[in-house]
Amino acid sequence: MKPSIAEMLHRGRMLWIILLSTIALGWTTPIPLIEDSEEIDEPCFDPCYCEVKESLFHIHCDSKGFTNISQITEFWSRPFKLYLQRNSMRKLYTNSFLHLNNAVSINLGNNALQDIQTGAFNGLKILKRLYLHENKLDVFRNDTFLGLESLEYLQADYNVIKRIESGAFRNLSKLRVLILNDNLIPMLPTNLFKAVSLTHLDLRGNRLKVLFYRGMLDHIGRSLMELQLEENPWNCTCEIVQLKSWLERIPYTALVGDITCETPFHFHGKDLREIRKTELCPLLSDSEVEASLGIPHSSSSKENAWPTKPSSMLSSVHFTASSVEYKSSNKQPKPTKQPRTPRPPSTSQALYPGPNQPPIAPYQTRPPIPIICPTGCTCNLHINDLGLTVNCKERGFNNISELLPRPLNAKKLYLSSNLIQKIYRSDFWNFSSLDLLHLGNNRISYVQDGAFINLPNLKSLFLNGNDIEKLTPGMFRGLQSLHYLYFEFNVIREIQPAAFSLMPNLKLLFLNNNLLRTLPTDAFAGTSLARLNLRKNYFLYLPVAGVLEHLNAIVQIDLNENPWDCTCDLVPFKQWIETISSVSVVGDVLCRSPENLTHRDVRTIELEVLCPEMLHVAPAGESPAQPGDSHLIGAPTSASPYEFSPPGGPVPLSVLILSLLVLFFSAVFVAAGLFAYVLRRRRKKLPFRSKRQEGVDLTGIQMQCHRLFEDGGGGGGGSGGGGRPTLSSPEKAPPVGHVYEYIPHPVTQMCNNPIYKPREEEEVAVSSAQEAGSAERGGPGTQPPGMGEALLGSEQFAETPKENHSNYRTLLEKEKEWALAVSSSQLNTIVTVNHHHPHHPAVGGVSGVVGGTGGDLAGFRHHEKNGGVVLFPPGGGCGSGSMLLDRERPQPAPCTVGFVDCLYGTVPKLKELHVHPPGMQYPDLQQDARLKETLLFSAGKGFTDHQTQKSDYLELRAKLQTKPDYLEVLEKTTYRF
């Protein structure tokens, strides 16, 4: 049965699917090359590690402790790469590599190599790469690289190479990349590169000052693609003009980085390509300079001349940079072929073509990245960091705001030689990535405060050749990363204090060729200036204090071409420049005046000649002043053996602070002395009071007045109890001038109050009692004067028991209350009892002992002191002074206070007795002072009631812990009938 048409179509589809699947599988499955399919039977060398990579045999023998190449005994028939870095090979001997003749790359880095003998590389005819970096090689001789005819890449950076002989590379005809950075090469010999055709040359970090055209630059030619000359101390004088002219003839992208001038000082830090030839060599014209140096005249044809492009490219220390050019035009930019970074360079066989062939793919630049460039400007993109160099020089811009569209990630912006007059804060809103801004040779006269606040990464700022007159701190706000600042060739007349304090990283400041006459205080405070150019201004002298003393890190300072006035004002400045290194001062510091010192260097003039008005010689042995000493002011200090008085001027801040400190400490000491003196005088004025005198003064609650003695008559003696007379008188009066002599006692004021005066009925009772007493007593001769009054006074208690019973009961209650109040107080009442001879009456006294009958109080006797009355129980316990002194007899019951009508009363004589005690009127008191005794009216000693119960005793003990108010106790102890 024949298959149907549908089946045939189905089978055909299946065949096509199988066929297409087979083809697709064949395309996707890699077919190994013949050489890869071959088994590599090359042995490895123990202890090394071997691998196959990119069809090459890699032998890793790094860090194995080899000291000689002869220790590697294995032979490899295939091309291989040998890694021998970080071993201990101090020397390469002749024919060391004969058995390694198939090596295409040898790495001998970091081996501390010190010498390479002649013929050490014999046998390495196919070697293309040789690494000698990080060793201790100091010379390349003419025969050092013999046997390396195929060498294309030589890396010898980070050695100590000081000398290269002119024929060192004569056999390296295929050499293309030469890396010699970070060595000590001071110069390159003539015809060194005559036999080579270098495309990459790295001479960074050496000691080159100049490169000559003849025999050096003319052999490099147009084959050079990348040249690095940074970090060399270039001497920008007439000799370097040939290098500048040669750089103008090579592709502007060939030079990576800047050629920064080191000397002379006025060109320090500037790019060589930014300096005119007439400035480098002002005595000759450009054509004369080129002719004298043998530089061929440049063609006037634009199509044959290399374009002159931006003056500066991206500066890189560890990486080379390739760049492409983009012009703001309608034409599509043509890519410039540039090599890749040679450190580490790519590895490839047949890497470099012939001299007339373009570079091959491994070194070609990738297609240009689309960039944004302002209209009318030229932009260069650096591939390594995608940074942009924007060249807008001589384009007629009037304002920075005209730069549209704004470029992205701009690193360098050149706006020199335009017509810009003012700079505003909004001008740099999209330039935060800038590290160089060139605004030189414009017409700038105004810079708004904070104009550069959007440039935090700026390292170099050029404002030279403008019309700026004043510098203020606000102009530099936001420039905390700035290192180089150029203000030369302006019309600056004023610099405000601390103008540069907002730039802590400032290393270089050029203020030369301005109109400055002085510098303000703290002009350089907060900076770390290493180089300062003050050349060609109008300085007569410079202050040290507050200005030059802040230049602690100064390396170079140019003070030339200023009209220095060599008088006394210049002495501190002279001392300062003598203390710093002589190398730091650039050029001469010549006097302009006075006439006798004209054209003489300040450093060579003696101080006596410079300032004849010096007053005295400073003490010998003082150390010289340092440049940072704060005491260097407008007069010489210990830096010289002389001192003088300055003619005038403001007082320096350091002297003012020191003076204020001296005044402050002096005031403190004077105040302390006055205080001590016043205390001492007060102690002398205060009287010395003994304890007995203090006892006499404590009369605050003494019972010193009684209504019965309003007359203040003399006291008398009596008999009662023991029948012994007892007299009492005040103690010795206070000394003259005593405080109590003019201060009345407060209790006297209270006794004058009418509420304490006796009532009329009491006065009637007193008068009747006096009459009755005089009838009962004997004749007047039986009693001493005043005793009658005392007896009459006691008779008031001698009424009928019926009449006085209630009064007596009230009296006992009041006595108990008063005793409790006195016992709880720490204030004691002192009563002094004086014993007098019986036949000596107490003249004018007020004390007495009365015995009498009648009533419950008839048996009490009373003692009076200064008008107060104290009642004693019968039996003479307290009745006489003799009883107080007789310690052999049994002690009587404790005395109690009977009744006190008032204190002091209203009797003027009693007041006078208190305020002016008549102690000095009784000489017998002085003789019998030893007989005086003091009764202390206090709880537990003199006046406790026998009837007080135990509970009352505990209460009294508790009250002893408090100190009642004086007036409160006084009120409690003042009673009336």
UniProtKB/Swiss-Prot annotation:
Keywords carried by this UniProt record: Glycoprotein, Leucine-rich repeat, Membrane, Repeat, Signal, Transmembrane, Transmembrane helix
Stretches assigned to the Cytoplasmic side: 676-977
Assigned GO CC terms: cell surface; GABA-ergic synapse; plasma membrane; postsynaptic density membrane; postsynaptic specialization membrane
Distribution of this protein across tissues and organs: Expressed in the occipital lobe of the cerebral cortex of the brain. Expressed at higher levels in some astrocytic brain tumors such as astrocytomas, oligodendrogliomas, glioblastomas, gangliogliomas and primitive neuroectodermal tumors.
Compositional bias of kind Gly residues: 711-724
Gene Ontology biological process terms, A to Z: axonogenesis; gephyrin clustering involved in postsynaptic density assembly; neurotransmitter-gated ion channel clustering; positive regulation of synapse assembly; regulation of presynapse assembly; synaptic membrane adhesion; synaptic transmission, GABAergic; terminal button organization
UniProt region (Disordered), positions on chain: 325-360, 708-735, 761-790
Domain LRRNT, first and last residues per copy: 364-406
Annotated LRRCT domain residues: 232-283, 562-613
Annotated glycosylation sites: N68, N596
Subcellular compartments: Membrane
Superkingdom: Eukaryota
Signal sequence annotation: 1-26
TM region(s), chain numbering: 655-675
Pfam family, any one: LRR_8
Side Extracellular, residues: 29-654
Disulfide bonds: none
Location (main, coarse): membrane
Ranges for the LRR repeats: 78-99, 102-123, 126-147, 150-171, 174-195, 197-218, 409-430, 433-454, 457-478, 481-502, 505-526, 528-549
InterPro entries: Cys-rich_flank_reg_C (IPR000483), Leu-rich_rpt (IPR001611), Leu-rich_rpt_typical-subtyp (IPR003591), LRR_dom_sf (IPR032675)
Membrane topology qualifier: Single-pass type I membrane protein
Biased composition (Low complexity): 765-775
Similarity field: Belongs to the SLITRK family.
Function of the molecule: Suppresses neurite outgrowth.
Name of the protein in question: SLIT and NTRK-like protein 3
Source organism of this protein record: Homo sapiens
Protein's gene: SLITRK3
